[in-house]
Amino acid sequence: FHILEVRAKETLTRAGEPGRWIDYSIDSLRADFLEVFAAIEKNSKGRYRIIYNLARQQPADYYVDFVVESADNRSVAMPLFFKDVMRDLIANARKYTAPGGTINVGVYETEAELRFVVQDTGRGIPPDEIQTVVHYGRRGSNVQQVRTMGGGYGLTKAFLVTKRFGGRFWIKSEPGIGTRITIIVPRPTGPRVG
């Protein structure tokens, strides 16, 4: 239930200040996402594991590489909504990648911008659908039969949040190879918020 408490607190905070950026220590951000990965694995009811050491990967395991860095090597500032975006895109990567696949996640903050990349070895998105897959409720035609608990809004939310903060959003994907989503958001000027 700890993860639900954290999400509820984040939601209430965002309601009052939707444009606010907040500083997260790199260690706490990593810990938060290790909890997210643990919850995803637990929800599988033993169908797969999420592992972080490639040498331990078995055929039913997802290998996850999750790296967070910043110019100061201590903290990363991001919009309050951005952790949700990260969670959604990571969940999509897992959902559309078969067990045995790889999910790479990178976060890097410079003085000028926040960069986020998630890349998987999943199904990919048909090339003629990349422009429209960010529309509300849309999924690629090659995943219509995949049973999901979501409504197809993760990419939409990621795209809209990125645009809301003046950022840039790219999808590079190839069916049968995987997908790479890159988001770059300019940092606001002024002091960092803790």
PLM regions: where:
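Short conserved segment of the HATPase_c
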Residues: 125-138
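Short helix-loop "hinge" at the ATP-lid/N-box region of the Bergerat-fold HATPase_c
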Residues: 93-94
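Acidic ATP/Mg2+-coordinating residue in the GHKL
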Residues: 120
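Hydrophobic Leu site in an alpha-helix of the histidine kinase catalytic ATPase core
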Residues: 151-155
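Glycine-rich ATP-binding loops of the HATPase_c
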Residues: 166-172
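Short beta-strand/loop element within the Bergerat-fold HATPase_c
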Residues: 100-112
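Glycine-rich GHKL/ HATPase_c ATP-binding element in histidine kinases
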Residues: 177-181
